[in-house]
């Protein structure tokens, strides 16, 4: 299941993301962060970390460097 979710994120990175303007305020991007978090911590914890990251990626947050810890 973990690999399938990562596969879906990679599809998003390859086919959907290039059609949209760059809006992620963080480095690495939210999709790359999600892949790293799910790979390192598994689907449940990594997924929750990804959701929290995506919720923080908005105009009211300055963003910046935020690696998976």
Curated annotation (Swiss-Prot):
<dbReference type="InterPro" id="IPR002696">
    <property type="entry name" value="Membr_insert_effic_factor_YidD"/>
</dbReference>
<comment type="similarity">
    <text>Belongs to the UPF0161 family.</text>
</comment>
<dbReference type="Pfam" id="PF01809">
    <property type="entry name" value="YidD"/>
</dbReference>
<protein>
    <recommendedName>
        <fullName>Putative membrane protein insertion efficiency factor</fullName>
    </recommendedName>
</protein>
<keyword id="KW-0472">Membrane</keyword>
<keyword id="KW-1003">Cell membrane</keyword>
<dbReference type="GO" id="GO:0005886">
    <property type="term" value="C:plasma membrane"/>
</dbReference>
<comment type="function">
    <text>Could be involved in insertion of integral membrane proteins into the membrane.</text>
</comment>
